[in-house]
Every structure is written in structure tokens, then in C-alpha cells.
């Protein structure tokens, strides 16, 4: 199984999480699995698989248990606390020259990774760029393959005749073994086989988008000054439009240089111009601009961009691609240059939103400064038994509360008595009677819906027992500290 990589040769790390819910900041991971391959998808190592049990301030979404079949009690028996779980993943991801790839990982799995690292004093970002690392998302490549070069792949459709990009549907339609969907290891194997299929059937497309996955390479496709249109493949445009459009890059965002402000040339540009001429800038919302055709492309999220020449003559009817009309619209934008500055200024509003008071939701408020980064590294290298001795002068106000939660969630026994009381009170406040009543009602409702399904009934019954056990545990901790 083991293959030896040449120095500086790219390797792929295919990975997937199963989680206890769909919120990437507030919900918790249940399982991580990864498989490392060489550039030709030959497996180089045994799969890595880790489980993580939830902390005392959290209960899983019952619906997630029914999807994955992973109960919190199972993770308590076979898994780690979130710090140990995160550290193991960190060690896997940081291997040099790794392209970290999954299926919908840019929007989901990578966000889970960032958030667990943020909560556990590991750098949330360096895993994706340090040591010549990068990331990529096969789901976006699959969408591009369907839109631009669909031959050679069997495409599942829904009842409306629209393409479905669910991993389990694609594997079934293309006779790819996928023995246990929503088990992380099974999903990783299936993703590798799907990548092999696309590379085999459409090698030029695969290699092109692999080459243009990083910001520096993507910037070579963008020429704002010459008003050069490009193809953008994204779920933003919807399946009716083949998840694709021709866009015109306008400018870089004033606040975030990773964001390319563009116009969707499929839309009626006249409407946008009239609207911006007749409505005061103070009354124009970001939603207004999006509805009228403004599109934001995040270059740090591996967007699928390509030159307009990728559309062949035989593709134009299938894609309803009207090159002549797009260039007419570009000329209209040139004549109304005021649009560009107006849009940039309206988009500045998006950065004026109030931040959440919950530190778990504050990962993107700002980057930590050099001083705090050094303290974060120091914490990550400190034994749990020595954490209580640390004297830390954080500059960023988030870190004091993060450090407290980090200790409480992972190493409760090292807390001082007053800290234990504070944590237990926080847990009781989070799992209050109103929340628990609604939570138990949801489980009982699902028990009625799935009364015919023995497996799901057992999962929900086990979860109900877990809820009472957890509340009793937290309640008795509170009694003992009183």
C-alpha cells in the first residue's frame, strides 16, 4: 500500500467529517476520516479515522444521529475530547505538499476544521497553505464537468430532470462502490473513486482546474482593466442554469482583497443601471445588488473560473450561451462606469454588521496579532496539568473566554472551584428547561415518525437516555460544588 513520494511532489489528502449537526461553528464533529494518495490516486497509507465526543454544554441534533448512525455514547467509548481529536487531525493535515480535498469541503468540512482548531488553540488557517499545502473541492469540479464537459459520466437527475450532485447518487449511477453513505471512511473512498473517474474521462478539464485552484493562478485568468469576461461555475446560479454563468470582473472588494466583485452577464444589466441611477446609495442594500446581478467570487475558496474560450461551438445551445449579447452588456457597463464605485461603496456595508457575543461564533471577527499567536502556540504545547499555572496577557478580548471554554470542555478537572461553578452554570443556562423541553419534544416527534423503523427507534431511544444522563451529570456536578 505504501508508495514513496518524490521530494516536493503533490499528494492528495481526501477527508470527510460526520457531525452532530450542520452548523459549522456551533455544532460538533463526531467522526473524521482521511486517506492519503499520490497524484494518480494510488493509496499511500492506511485510512485515519477518529471519533470525538461532545462537551457538557452541547447536545447533538437528533436528525444528525439518524443520518450518520453515530451516537454520542459511541463517541464517548471510542473517541477523544475535542482537543485531542483536533490535534490528531492537525498532525495529519500539516504533512508537506498536501492538497486537502473533499466533497463540499470548502463550504462544510474545511469550516469544521477551522472552527475546531480555533476553539482548541491551533492555527485555524495554516494547515491549508503552510508547507506548500493547498485545498480543493471535488464537488465544484463535478459541477464544472457537468456544465462544460459532461460526456463520459452518468449524471443522476431528479423528478424535474435537473442534475443531482449528491455523492451517493453519483456513485450509484456510475457503479462506484459506496457501501455505507454517511460513514466518513466510506465517503472518502467514494470521493477518491469519483475523482479517478473524472480524471480518466475528462483529463484536460481535471488538470486545468487543479492547476487553477490557488489565488495566484486564478488571478492570471482575471483582467479587470480590459473588461474581459470569464466563465464561473457555482451552485449560486442554480441547476436550471447548469450552475454556470459568464461574468464580468469589475473590481476587488475594498475591505477584502480575496473578493472579486463581478456582474452576472446573464442578468438584465439595464435594470441594474436604472436602479442605481434612481435610488439613493443610502437606500441600496447588498441584497438589491445581488438580485440585480452583482456576484462576489471568493478567490480563497477555490472557485471554478475559466476563460470564455472554454465554451465550444457545440456547447452554446446546450448552455444557452449568448456571447454576442454578453459583449453588448459589457459595452453598457463601460458606458456606465459609475456603477463600479457605487457597488464597491454599497458592499462596504456588509462589514458593518454587529459581531456575535458568543465567542464560538467570532472566528472571522479578525486575525490574531503576532503577540497572541505566540501565546496560542504556547498553550497548544502545554500539558493539560500545567494550563492552570499559565499567566497569559491576551491582547484580543476573545482569547480569555476561549481559553476558559477550552479548559472547561477538555480538562474540567484542572479548573479551580470558582471556574467549575462558572462552567456548570453556563452549561445549565445553555441546556435550560425551555431548550430541553423542545429538544425532547423533537426526539419524541421523530420516534412517532419512525415508529416502523427499529434501527432509528433504537438510535433515538439511546439519544433520549443520553440526554437524561448528561443533564443528571451536569446537575450533580452543580450540587457537589454548591
Curated annotation (Swiss-Prot):
Important for interaction with ssb, annotated site positions: 149
EC number(s) from the headed UniProt entry: 3.1.11.1
Keywords, comma-separated and alphabetical: DNA damage, DNA repair, DNA-binding, Exonuclease, Hydrolase, Magnesium, Metal-binding, Nuclease
Top enzyme category: hydrolase
Binding-site list for Mg(2+) 1: 16
Mitochondrion as UniProt keyword: no
Keyword Membrane in record: no
Site (Interaction with single-stranded DNA): 114, 125, 129, 143, 215, 258, 300, 364, 367
Protein name: Exodeoxyribonuclease I
Phylogenetic lineage: Bacteria, Pseudomonadati, Pseudomonadota, Gammaproteobacteria, Enterobacterales
Amino acid at each position: 500500500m505504501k508508495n514513496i513520494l518524490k521530494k516536493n511532489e503533490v499528494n492528495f489528502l481526501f477527508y470527510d467529517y460526520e457531525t452532530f449537526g450542520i452548523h459549522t461553528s456551533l455544532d460538533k464533529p463526531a467522526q473524521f476520516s482521511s486517506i492519503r494518495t499520490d497524484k494518480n490516486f494510488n493509496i499511500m497509507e492506511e485510512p485515519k479515522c477518529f471519533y470525538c465526543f461532545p462537551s457538557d454544554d452541547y447536545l447533538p441534533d437528533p436528525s444528525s444521529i439518524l443520518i450518520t448512525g453515530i451516537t454520542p455514547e459511541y463517541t464517548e467509548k471510542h473517541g477523544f475530547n475535542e482537543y485531542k481529536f483536533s490535534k490528531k487531525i492537525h498532525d495529519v493535515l500539516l504533512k508537506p505538499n498536501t492538497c486537502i480535498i473533499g466533497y463540499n469541503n470548502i463550504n462544510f468540512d474545511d469550516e469544521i476544521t477551522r472552527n475546531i482548531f480555533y476553539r482548541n488553540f491551533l492555527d485555524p488557517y495554516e494547515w491549508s497553505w503552510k508547507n506548500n499545502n493547498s485545498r480543493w473541492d471535488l464537488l465544484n469540479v463535478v459541477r464544472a464537468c457537468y456544465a462544460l464537459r459532461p460526456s463520459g459520466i452518468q449524471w443522476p437527475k431528479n423528478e424535474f430532470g435537473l442534475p443531482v450532485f449528491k455523492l451517493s447518487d453519483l456513485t450509484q449511477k456510475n457503479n462506484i462502490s459506496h457501501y455505507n453513505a454517511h460513514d466518513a471512511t466510506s465517503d472518502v473512498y467514494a470521493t477518491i473513486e469519483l475523482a479517478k473517474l473524472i480524471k480518466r474521462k475528462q483529463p484536460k478539464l481535471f488538470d486545468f482546474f487543479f492547476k487553477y485552484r490557488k489565488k495566484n493562478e486564478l488571478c492570471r485568468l482575471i483582467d479587470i482593466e480590459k473588461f474581459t469576461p470569464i466563465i464561473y461555475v457555482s451552485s449560486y446560479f442554480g441547476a436550471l442554469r447548469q450552475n454556470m454563468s459568464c461574468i464580468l470582473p469589475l473590481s476587488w472588494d475594498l475591505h477584502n482583497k480575496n473578493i472579486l466583485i463581478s456582474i452576472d452577464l446573464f442578468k438584465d444589466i439595464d435594470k441594474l443601471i436604472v436602479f442605481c441611477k434612481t435610488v439613493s446609495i443610502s437606500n441600496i442594500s447588498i441584497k438589491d445588488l445581488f438580485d440585480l446581478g452583482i456576484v462576489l467570487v471568493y478567490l480563497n475558496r477555490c472557485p471554478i473560473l475559466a476563460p470564455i474560450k472554454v465554451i465550444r461551438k457545440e456547447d452554446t445551445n446546450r448552455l444557452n450561451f449568448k456571447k454576442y449579447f454578453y459583449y453588448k452588456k459589457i459595452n453598457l457597463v463601460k458606458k456606465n462606469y459609475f456603477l463600479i464605485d457605487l457597488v464597491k461603496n454599497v458592499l462596504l456595508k456588509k462589514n458593518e454588521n454587529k459581531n456575535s457575543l458568543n465567542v464560538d461564533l467570532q472566528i472571522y471577527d479578525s486575525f490574531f496579532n503576532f503577540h497572541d499567536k505566540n501565546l496560542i502556540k504556547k498553550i497548544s504545547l502545554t500539558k493539560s496539568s500545567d494550563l492552570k499555572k499559565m499567566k497569559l496577557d491576551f491582547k484580543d478580548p476573545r482569547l480569555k473566554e476561549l481559553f476558559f471554554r477550552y479548559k472547561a470542555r477538555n480538562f474540567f478537572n484542572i479548573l479551580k472551584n470558582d471556574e467549575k461553578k462558572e462552567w456548570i452554570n453556563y452549561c445549565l443556562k445553555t441546556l435550560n428547561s425551555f431548550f430541553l423541553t423542545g429538544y425532547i419534544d423533537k426526539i419524541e416527534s421523530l420516534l412517532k415518525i419512525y415508529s416502523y423503523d427499529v434501527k432509528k427507534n433504537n438510535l433515538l431511544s439511546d439519544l433520549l437516555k443520553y440526554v437524561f444522563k448528561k443533564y443528571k451529570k451536569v446537575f450533580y456536578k452543580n450540587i457537589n460544588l454548591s
